[in-house]
A protein has these predicted regions:
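Glycine/proline-rich loop-helix segments at beta-alpha junctions forming the active-site rim
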Residues: 62, 77-114
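Conserved active-site segments centered on acidic
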Residues: 1-84
Length: 114
């Protein structure tokens, strides 16, 4: 079975997108569907690259019992968007603007604004 590859994008990949990634992974795992999905997150800007999840975000995941790993912020690439992910969920309109700059064109149908 081919996995549906879902990517969450936000500004720095230290708060919203990794939280969405780990919440979605937990939801999928709780339903026994982890083999059906590949879930990831990334940033649309470079300023937080290499940084860990924002401590208050990490604390909230812990409080809610949502497992997370030693995530480090990373920058999305045009190639990943075009050739790898099936669905890209962008956190806000500003992130969509940055994504347009990365892609060099208007985002296609696999891009969704949350």
């Amino acid at each position: 079975m081919e996995q549906l590859k879902i990517l969450f994008l936000c500004h720095g990949n230290i708060c919203r997108s990794p939280m969405a990634e780990f919440i979605m992974k937990d939801l999928v795992r709780s339903r026994g569907l982890q083999d059906c999905f590949l879930i990831d997150s990334a940033a649309v800007t470079t300023e937080e690259i290499g940084n860990a999840i924002y401590p208050p975000a990490k604390r909230k995941l812990y409080e809610k019992g949502i497992p997370f790993d030693d995530h480090r912020a990373r920058l999305i690439t045009k190639k990943e968007i075009e050739d790898y992910y099936d669905m890209v969920l962008v956190m806000d309109i500003s992130n969509l603007w940055y994504l347009r700059r990365i892609l060099g064109v208007e985002p296609g149908p696999k891009i969704r604004l949350m």
